[in-house]
């Protein structure tokens, strides 16, 4: 059996894996155990009551967190004309069409989010093998294919998170940084869970949000008692 590191022993002693914690207690635990030499992200895993093998039960979308994610987000926008000027005014770092596509083909990937106006998808479509595996391909469901690219840029800059269930029916995303206040992390988590509940597939049966766990970049997961969250039913 692998020897536990000092950090892992501390986590094991502090976190009861069988318990669901009050959100305030859960965040306090994360903060106490976040001893990395950098400001760790606070991530969330939400187990959904869906059958991910069925396409009509998959959950995908985006929502803006009230307190953002704590990350500086670089945005690339595929568009032209007046939309290009609007995207630049909204704060997009990279704006273009074919010339932007050529940069990406050459390996220049200095951005975190890709947004496209519908007329630009003919160009973006050719980048599927590059953007797709990185989770960067624009999609109408996440608001990244839209005629209003300026609003999409503002949302991305304001702390929009995109979510999509994995093959096990679990949503993984981030809700901030460990140096956020407890209230900020709580409100961000509540906003995410409310968005997920609104995105519940009509064919999904039974309990939809089955389990919520939060963790830091280098830490263990702490289960959250959903009764301590204020979310839409």
UniProtKB/Swiss-Prot annotation:
Which Pfam families has this protein been placed in?
Ribosomal_L1
Q: Which GO terms describe its biological process?
A: regulation of translation; translation
Kindly indicate whether the keyword Chloroplast belongs to this entry: no
UniProt entry keywords in alphabetical sequence: Repressor, Ribonucleoprotein, Ribosomal protein, RNA-binding, rRNA-binding, Translation regulation, tRNA-binding
Q: Which family does it belong to?
A: Belongs to the universal ribosomal protein uL1 family.
User: Subunit structure of this entry?
Assistant: Part of the 50S ribosomal subunit.
Function according to Swiss-Prot or TrEMBL: Binds directly to 23S rRNA. The L1 stalk is quite mobile in the ribosome, and is involved in E site tRNA release.
Name-wise, this protein is Large ribosomal subunit protein uL1
Question: Its gene?
Answer: rplA
């Amino acid at each position: 059996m692998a020897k536990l590191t000092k950090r892992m022993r501390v986590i094991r002693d502090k976190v009861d894996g069988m318990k669901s914690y009050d959100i305030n207690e859960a965040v306090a635990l994360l903060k106490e155990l976040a001893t990395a030499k950098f400001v760790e992200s606070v991530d969330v895993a939400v187990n959904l009551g869906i059958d991910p093998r069925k396409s009509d039960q998959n959950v995908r979308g985006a929502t803006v967190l009230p307190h953002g994610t704590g990350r500086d987000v670089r945005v690339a926008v595929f568009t032209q004309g007046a939309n290009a000027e609007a995207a630049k005014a909204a704060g997009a770092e990279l704006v273009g069409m074919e010339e932007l596509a050529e940069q990406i083909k050459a390996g220049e990937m200095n951005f975190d989010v890709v947004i496209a106006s519908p007329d630009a998808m003919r160009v973006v479509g050719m980048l599927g093998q590059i953007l797709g595996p990185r989770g960067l391909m624009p999609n109408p469901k996440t608001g990244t294919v839209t005629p209003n690219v300026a609003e999409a840029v503002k949302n991305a800059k304001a702390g929009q998170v995109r979510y999509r269930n994995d093959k096990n029916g679990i949503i993984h995303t981030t809700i901030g940084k460990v140096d956020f206040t407890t209230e900020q992390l709580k409100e961000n988590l509540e906003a995410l869970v409310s968005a997920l509940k609104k995105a519940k597939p009509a064919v999904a049966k039974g309990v939809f949000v089955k389990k919520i766990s939060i963790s830091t970049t280098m830490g263990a997961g702490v289960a959250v008692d959903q009764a301590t969250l204020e979310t839409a039913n």
